[in-house]
Amino acid sequence: MAKKETKHTPLTKLKFQDPIFGISFHPEQPRFVVGSSTGTVTAYKYSVDPQSATCGAPEVVWTTKRHKGSCRALIYSEDGSSVYSVGSDGVIKRADSQSGKVRAKNTESLPSTPSCIVRSEAYVAVGCEDGSIVAFDKTSLAEKHRAEGAHDGECVNALLELTHQNKHSFASLGSTTACVVDVRKGVKSTSDDQEDEILCGTMAAKDMGVCGMSQGQITTWTLGFNDQQNRVKLSEESIDAVIGAEDDYEVYAGGGEGIVWLANVKSGKKLDQFVHSRNDEVSFLDLDYQYRLVTASMNSLKLWPTADDEQKQAEVAAAKGAEEEQKAAPSGPPRKKHKKVKNKAHNPGVAHFGDL
């Protein structure tokens, strides 16, 4: 257990009418996009006050019916100028992130329903439900390479870029195995059977991958992804989303309990926790451009404060409390109390006229 259970309050939250299947936050601006079960993609903006660390409700920038069926996944480009999305219609599109206008699309290359999308130095790569991985040109969306047969034809749940090997390599996670794939040559290696479904993954550092498992654990992997090296038990329910934190070897992980844990995968310790919901699972995690944690279920999204944000909030609250206390105090200087003059006592050394 974490040493201390800290209660955090989200900066802002958003509820959705239709179930969401994907979120992505802009790498340089306070913006994000959401893809829904109806095929709609919506872009939002928000503003966090730099002095008080408060945030109002997100505002819609644009919304459009982007895919027939559902939008299965989406992601910003490296500089945030484009948004890539894939749908159950088998189409991948690149749109201008400011206007939402489509700049390129490919309607023919996906062999089955897409399940995930990742951006790398060289490609936009899409994992599919039949174990295929298709790499696209980032500008034209022309198909560049295709690898098939990962996970014995089972669904690709997550893709991780492995740029330390070369720009063509990815780790594919799905079913009960992890595969290293060169999109030019196909599957290079497959891990031992984990006897537990691998649902998600992230890179915790340049030399370590982390996977979320269906039995409530996160597992650590070396770069060869041959077998897990260590495991950390977080929950009695599945870990459906995991993302690297700002510091190496630290990750955020959440799932069926509706709780997100910050954990150090080297020490195996829980460092902090964020309660997204007591009723809904955590399906998606992201970080905004200032490394604020984002948690989302299929019907709600929350943006959480950083430690610096919480420090600013505490300072503002303390200053406000002092101001209110001062207002409640009586105005003006305190009145001085006048002493009553007592009758002087008879002085036996002086004669009274009546005695003369």
Curated annotation (Swiss-Prot):
<feature type="region of interest" description="Disordered">
    <location>
        <begin position="312"/>
        <end position="356"/>
    </location>
</feature>
<feature type="compositionally biased region" description="Basic residues">
    <location>
        <begin position="334"/>
        <end position="345"/>
    </location>
</feature>
<feature type="repeat" description="WD 6">
    <location>
        <begin position="277"/>
        <end position="314"/>
    </location>
</feature>
<feature type="repeat" description="WD 4">
    <location>
        <begin position="193"/>
        <end position="231"/>
    </location>
</feature>
<protein>
    <recommendedName>
        <fullName>WD repeat-containing protein JIP5</fullName>
    </recommendedName>
</protein>
<feature type="repeat" description="WD 1">
    <location>
        <begin position="15"/>
        <end position="54"/>
    </location>
</feature>
<keyword id="KW-0539">Nucleus</keyword>
<dbReference type="InterPro" id="IPR001680">
    <property type="entry name" value="WD40_rpt"/>
</dbReference>
<feature type="repeat" description="WD 2">
    <location>
        <begin position="66"/>
        <end position="105"/>
    </location>
</feature>
<dbReference type="InterPro" id="IPR015943">
    <property type="entry name" value="WD40/YVTN_repeat-like_dom_sf"/>
</dbReference>
<dbReference type="InterPro" id="IPR017422">
    <property type="entry name" value="WDR55"/>
</dbReference>
<dbReference type="InterPro" id="IPR050505">
    <property type="entry name" value="WDR55_POC1"/>
</dbReference>
<feature type="repeat" description="WD 3">
    <location>
        <begin position="107"/>
        <end position="146"/>
    </location>
</feature>
<feature type="repeat" description="WD 5">
    <location>
        <begin position="234"/>
        <end position="275"/>
    </location>
</feature>
<keyword id="KW-0677">Repeat</keyword>
<dbReference type="InterPro" id="IPR036322">
    <property type="entry name" value="WD40_repeat_dom_sf"/>
</dbReference>
<comment type="similarity">
    <text>Belongs to the WD repeat WDR55 family.</text>
</comment>
<keyword id="KW-0853">WD repeat</keyword>
<dbReference type="GO" id="GO:0005730">
    <property type="term" value="C:nucleolus"/>
</dbReference>
